[in-house]
UniProtKB/Swiss-Prot annotation:
NCBIfam families: MFR_anch_SdhE. Membrane anchor subunit of 8-methylmenaquinol:fumarate reductase (MFR), that catalyzes the reduction of fumarate using 8-methylmenaquinol-6 as electron donor. The complex shows no succinate oxidation activity. Is involved in anaerobic metabolism. SdhE likely contains the quinol/quinone binding site. This is 8-methylmenaquinol:fumarate reductase membrane anchor subunit. Its EC number is 1.3.5.-. Pfam families: CCG. It is an enzyme of class 1 (oxidoreductase). The MFR complex is composed of three subunits: a flavoprotein (SdhA), an iron-sulfur protein (SdhB), and one hydrophobic anchor protein (SdhE). GO terms for cellular component: periplasmic space; plasma membrane. It comes from Wolinella succinogenes (strain ATCC 29543 / DSM 1740 / CCUG 13145 / JCM 31913 / LMG 7466 / NCTC 11488 / FDC 602W). It is found in: Periplasm; Cell membrane. Its main location: periplasm.
Length: 284
């Protein structure tokens, strides 16, 4: 297992999903991983910025990657949308945009060389699942889990390319290594609705409600996702979505790092479970 990474938290971990950052920082040393946060990182520009000014967004992400290169480390992020943006930027730069973008970076005495790879917590754990399994102190044998990949852990497959976007297995493999039971969950590859909340709130709420109700029907004790944006949508908006749907079902939604932490024997509070909106503290 790669032991040291240039950590790109992204905006959401710095504000709205502090429990995600708290939990990954709690599990990293137990797994023997050193996270060095990229000093001076900037927003990846997903959604708004990339639509308004794609060139500026590419420059910003080239800068983020260049900062990691200065650390001589691969980039690790837990946000699937950040993963997609950084991976796409690297691919575009490596295909020939590097010289143009470096002309902008040069104004800040920086340059992109293409030496740092981009990965995610999901991918790192999947690639080292036996090592993860060996560190489990509290097998989650009584826990039924609905795994929810979300969009940007898998799609577009041509940009990410880690595994099949229609028949992925990495997440299930990780959860089973933690000792938990993976329940059949037909919405595991669906969109959570996060990026539709503002332009199409009604549709987003239907997506959220459908996911939660399907998880409940599968008798899952919790939904777990590798993406903090998916977690926010399914957790923070769950109450509103279920009221609109007139559903009484409520299901805790965990970050992948929180589930891993429970299996490693880390106390629930250290994993930020008290920050989750739908009560998840009983799971720990």
């Amino acid at each position: 297992m790669q032991k040291e990474f240039a950590f790109f938290p992204g905006c959401v971990l710095s504000q709205a999903a502090i429990e995600s950052k708290k939990s990954i920082e709690a599990i990293a040393p137990v797994l023997g991983i050193k996270l060095r946060e990229i000093e001076g990182w900037s927003c990846c520009g997903a959604s708004q910025a990339q639509c308004v000014d794609p060139l500026a967004t590419l420059v910003a992400n080239a800068r983020n990657l260049a900062l990691a290169e200065q650390m001589n480390l691969p980039v690790l992020t837990t946000c699937s949308t950040c993963l997609l943006m950084l991976t796409r930027a690297k691919a575009e730069l490596d295909r020939g945009a590097k010289d143009q973008i470096n002309s902008f970076l040069a104004k800040g005495n920086m340059s992109y060389q293409g030496t740092s790879e981009v990965t995610s917590l999901l991918w790192v754990l999947a690639q080292n699942v036996e090592e993860l399994k060996s560190k489990v102190k509290k097998p989650l044998s009584n826990l039924k889990v609905a795994v929810f990949y979300g969009c940007h852990s898998l799609r577009p497959e041509k940009d990410l390319g880690f595994e099949s976007s229609t028949n992925p297995t990495s997440f299930e493999t990780i959860v089973k290594a933690l000792g938990a039971q993976v329940v059949p969950f037909e919405k595991r590859l669906n969109c959570c609705g996060f990026h539709a909340v503002y332009p199409a709130e009604s549709s987003a709420m239907k997506m959220t409600s459908g996911i939660i109700n399907t998880a409940a029907k599968s008798e899952a004790h919790c939904v777990v996702t590798p993406c903090p944006l998916c977690q926010m949508q399914l957790d923070i908006y769950q109450e509103d979505a279920q009221k609109i749907a007139k559903s009484k079902e409520r299901v805790p939604v965990l970050h992948l790092s929180q589930l891993v932490g429970l299996a490693l024997g880390i106390p629930a509070k250290e994993l930020g479970l008290n920050h989750n909106v739908i009560d998840a503290t009983k799971l720990g």
